[in-house]
Amino acid sequence: MGSILEKIEQALKDMLIGWIESNLTNMFTDVNEKVGTIAAEVGQTPSGWNGGVYQMIRGLSENVIVPIAGIIITFVLCYELISMITEKNNLHDMDTWMFFKWFFKAAVAIYLVTHTFDIVMAVFDIGQNVVSGAAGVIHGNTSIDIDATIAQMRTGMENMGVGELLGLSIETLLISLCLKIMAILITVILYGRMIEIYCTVSIAPIPIATMSNREWGSIGTNYLKGLFALAFQGFLIMVCVGIYAVLINGMIIADSIHSALFSVAAYTVILCFSLFKTGSLAKSIFHAH
């Protein structure tokens, strides 16, 4: 009778250990894949992320916003010309060189507006290059050895009773669910960032049109700061994910499986909070309003 109960207990333990290992395998696989997935997403330029949306935004910008930018350029250049003439002792001290200066400013302003998308794409190409370089370093140093980790944990699980294994299986299920929710939140953050990029790019000709004027130029300058902040937000996202992966990799080899799992849950919450803060951090770094 005792041997039968022992066999039943061992069968239950084997079943629970198998379930726990399955949950852990899925969990660690998600962690490894998430680093690569986020790198692929945040490294996309507006033209590469979704070609259809990009063409729509570019069409709206060129057909709707550029004419408005042309009106703004006209106003800015007229204001600039009047200021240049009147500031020289009320027309009594005029220099023909100022007109060459004005024509140069006009040419620069028109060139910037007509090449707005080239300028904007250059900013995001820089951001993509930085993110791609970071992805290679981060993913190469933080990939979790799933087989070795599971084997190490199995040694500890074999010494547990049925009740403790049942509790551990529930813990792994909850942590795995937490990671799934985190994946959804990360998707929301990444898609929200791209939508913000498209909205910012769509109106680019208007702030760019003001850059040739001293008084209005701060509008265009601040706009470019915001563009660089959006481009380098991807790098900050990669840094957050890299820190997350390193911390999880360190907790996996902890002596207490329960402690390691709850640490994973805590780091997951911290990661989500950090990702939400990357946008404001990037803007503060580039001093963009």
Regions found by a protein language model. Give the residues of each.
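Membrane-embedded alpha-helices of multi-pass transport/permease systems
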Residues: 75, 120-123, 127, 185-188, ...
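Hydrophobic alpha-helical transmembrane segments
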Residues: 67-79, 197
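Gly/Ser-rich, low-complexity
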Residues: 1-72, 88-97, 107-178, 217-222, ...
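Alpha-helical transmembrane segments of helical membrane proteins, especially in multi-pass transport
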Residues: 175, 179-211, 225-247
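Membrane-water interface regions at transmembrane-helix termini and the short interhelical loops
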Residues: 81-94, 183-187, 215-216
